[in-house]
Amino acid sequence: MAMTVHCDIVSAEQEIFSGAIELLVAASVEGDVGINYGHAPLLTALKPGPVRVKKLDGEEEIFYVSGGYLEVQPHVVTVLADTALRAGDMDEAAAEAAMKEAEQAIQSSEGLDYSKAAAQLAESAAQLRTLQAIRKKLQR
């Protein structure tokens, strides 16, 4: 039997996932991290992007988080996200439109709030990376 750890992925609004997993991979501010059974305790900030979870049956599920924190305890991994979505619930067209809008705002610089536009651009790019990860998974 595979060694597992319990995982909870929650946003401010709701619990997105709860269950036993073999592996979790996320983008932290220090770089990508992979968490499995026996990992040392850890608390790190997350960048916007995909969170991949490998469940007991070998199935991989992908979520999008807009940032937040990852906490690793001996038997529990918790993702506390600002916003969390199942990747299947994301709208690719809306993410592309938001990315183009942010790029145009940065280029035009009229009444520009650069930090807001840059944050919107980073979040849209992260959403698109998450959707690309799903496509790649489906092509296997």
Swiss-Prot record:
<dbReference type="InterPro" id="IPR020546">
    <property type="entry name" value="ATP_synth_F1_dsu/esu_N"/>
</dbReference>
<dbReference type="InterPro" id="IPR020547">
    <property type="entry name" value="ATP_synth_F1_esu_C"/>
</dbReference>
<dbReference type="Pfam" id="PF02823">
    <property type="entry name" value="ATP-synt_DE_N"/>
</dbReference>
<protein>
    <recommendedName>
        <fullName>ATP synthase epsilon chain</fullName>
    </recommendedName>
</protein>
<dbReference type="GO" id="GO:0005524">
    <property type="term" value="F:ATP binding"/>
</dbReference>
<dbReference type="InterPro" id="IPR036794">
    <property type="entry name" value="ATP_F1_dsu/esu_C_sf"/>
</dbReference>
<keyword id="KW-0406">Ion transport</keyword>
<comment type="similarity">
    <text>Belongs to the ATPase epsilon chain family.</text>
</comment>
<keyword id="KW-0997">Cell inner membrane</keyword>
<keyword id="KW-0813">Transport</keyword>
<comment type="function">
    <text>Produces ATP from ADP in the presence of a proton gradient across the membrane.</text>
</comment>
<comment type="subunit">
    <text>F-type ATPases have 2 components, CF(1) - the catalytic core - and CF(0) - the membrane proton channel. CF(1) has five subunits: alpha(3), beta(3), gamma(1), delta(1), epsilon(1). CF(0) has three main subunits: a, b and c.</text>
</comment>
<dbReference type="InterPro" id="IPR036771">
    <property type="entry name" value="ATPsynth_dsu/esu_N"/>
</dbReference>
<dbReference type="GO" id="GO:0005886">
    <property type="term" value="C:plasma membrane"/>
</dbReference>
<keyword id="KW-1003">Cell membrane</keyword>
<keyword id="KW-0139">CF(1)</keyword>
<keyword id="KW-0472">Membrane</keyword>
<keyword id="KW-0066">ATP synthesis</keyword>
<dbReference type="GO" id="GO:0046933">
    <property type="term" value="F:proton-transporting ATP synthase activity, rotational mechanism"/>
</dbReference>
<dbReference type="GO" id="GO:0045259">
    <property type="term" value="C:proton-transporting ATP synthase complex"/>
</dbReference>
<dbReference type="InterPro" id="IPR001469">
    <property type="entry name" value="ATP_synth_F1_dsu/esu"/>
</dbReference>
<dbReference type="Pfam" id="PF00401">
    <property type="entry name" value="ATP-synt_DE"/>
</dbReference>
<keyword id="KW-0375">Hydrogen ion transport</keyword>
